[in-house]
């Protein structure tokens, strides 16, 4: 199944289309998926990359019940680099070795938590506990539970660096402190 556009064959596709954007049109527009399944194209940012796009991977990495999956070096790296995260639902879990009721603990610890959708980007749907009133945080908790696909995550210090920024149309610029947000890409196992 060769993928073409206006009669020109396509061998490589850099996919920017999100899976949740493709699902509603997949039946009417199957050519991309068919070519991918047939191995007729090389797809950069393939559908298999969706796993790391899902933020719930952090809940697996930081949950005590999955510690047995990792060796000591991996556990050390996880503890150092991955914020404590849980799929947000009405359940018992642990935080720093202490048994907690996740919903009530989340309600009581808004000062250090965020609620975020598992499958979104660009800050969409995020509730920031430390910027919320108690009533807003209660509403966020209710919305996240009703949605069913939210995470609760502990606040981490966000890195800041100086970056050049244009200040006018004449090309003047200045160094401005900005948050650092890296989106590393992997290709054949290399960053």
Question: Where does each model-flagged region fall?
Answer:
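Domain-scale recognition of functional cores that engage charged ligands
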Residues: 1-191
């Amino acid at each position: 199944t060769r993928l073409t556009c206006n009669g020109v064959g396509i061998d490589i596709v850099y996919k920017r289309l999100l899976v949740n954007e493709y699902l509603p049109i997949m039946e009417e527009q199957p050519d991309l998926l068919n070519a991918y399944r047939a191995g007729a194209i090389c797809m950069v940012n393939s559908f298999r990359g969706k796993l790391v796009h899902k933020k719930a991977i952090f809940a697996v990495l930081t949950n005590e019940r999955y510690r047995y999956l990792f060796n000591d070096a991996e556990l050390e790296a996880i503890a150092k680099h991955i914020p404590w995260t849980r799929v947000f639902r009405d359940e018992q879990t642990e935080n720093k070795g202490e048994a907690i009721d996740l919903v009530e603990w989340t309600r009581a610890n808004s000062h250090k938590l965020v609620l975020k959708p598992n499958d979104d980007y660009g800050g969409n749907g995020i509730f920031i506990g430390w910027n919320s009133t108690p009533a807003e945080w209660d509403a966020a908790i209710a919305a996240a539970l009703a949605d069913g696909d939210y995470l609760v995550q502990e606040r981490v210090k966000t890195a800041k660096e100086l970056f050049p920024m244009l200040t006018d149309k004449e090309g003047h610029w200045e160094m401005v402190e900005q948050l650092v947000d890296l989106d590393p890409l992997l290709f054949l196992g290399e960053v």
